[in-house]
């Protein structure tokens, strides 16, 4: 038998999601807020972790509260599912950014100027030992200085920072969600025990 669910996200969550999309696409890309405000990308990825966890949490909570299914997840499991859902969304988004950079020749994985690099490819002995170049103040490509004041890291630091702040946003919401569901779960158990006691 097929079971259908009427999915209703809280109005406040829907508004926040729309504001997030506007902030990322209209302000971030078109109005170039990513360039004007260096923290813009970090704030949005943190918020993304929070929102994706909220959506994952809402979906699991929908199943928990539905009368059509025998489905009751513990508060801890609900929080874990919300966290994993958020991290999966974050990783898939980074795949999307990488794909757009490779296929469409964009620059969604923003570059970072750094002053130290370490690589085993630079080891003169050809061994698996990281060789460091420190205090980099300029880099030349094909004999032409880039004038950036350091070495240009193409996307790695941006990707890792995005995933880390996504992790933080997801973790914060999952912890808050855990305590919210736990309190509601305990209230439901109390009401059920009270009903059983009154029955007998």
Language-model segments: residues:
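Membrane-interface helix-boundary motifs at transmembrane edges
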Residues: 2-12, 68-73
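Transmembrane alpha-helix boundary signature
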Residues: 2-7, 26-35, 62-63
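Cytoplasmic-side transmembrane-helix entry/capping segments in multi-pass membrane proteins
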Residues: 8-19, 42-45
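Alpha-helical transmembrane segments of multi-pass integral membrane proteins
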Residues: 19-24, 48-56, 78-93
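Interfacial helix-loop-helix junctions of multi-pass membrane proteins
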Residues: 30-41, 87-173
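Membrane-interfacial alpha-helical segments at the cytosolic side of multi-pass membrane proteins
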Residues: 47-64, 102-108, 168-182
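Alpha-helical transmembrane bundle and helix-membrane interface signal
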Residues: 60-74, 114-120, 182-186
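Short, highly charged, low-complexity non-transmembrane loops/tails of multi-pass membrane proteins
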Residues: 187-200
């Amino acid at each position: 038998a097929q079971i259908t669910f009427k999915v209703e996200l809280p109005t406040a969550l829907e508004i926040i999601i729309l504001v997030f999309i506007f902030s990322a696409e209209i302000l971030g890309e078109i109005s170039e807020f990513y360039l004007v405000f260096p923290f813009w990308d970090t704030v949005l990825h943190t918020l993304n972790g929070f929102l994706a966890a909220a959506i994952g949490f809402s979906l699991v909570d929908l199943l928990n509260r539905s009368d059509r299914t025998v489905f009751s997840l513990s508060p801890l499991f609900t929080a874990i599912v919300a966290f994993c859902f958020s991290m999966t969304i974050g990783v898939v988004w980074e795949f999307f950014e990488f794909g757009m950079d490779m296929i469409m020749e964009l620059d969604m994985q923003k570059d970072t100027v750094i002053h130290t690099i370490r690589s085993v490819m630079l080891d003169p002995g050809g061994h698996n030992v990281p060789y460091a170049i420190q205090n980099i103040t300029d880099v030349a490509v094909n004999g032409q200085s880039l004038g950036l004041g350091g070495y240009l890291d193409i996307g790695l630091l941006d990707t890792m920072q995005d995933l880390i702040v996504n992790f933080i946003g997801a973790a914060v919401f999952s912890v808050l969600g855990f305590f919210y569901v736990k309190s509601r779960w305990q209230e439901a158990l109390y009401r059920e025990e009270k009903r059983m006691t009154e029955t007998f």
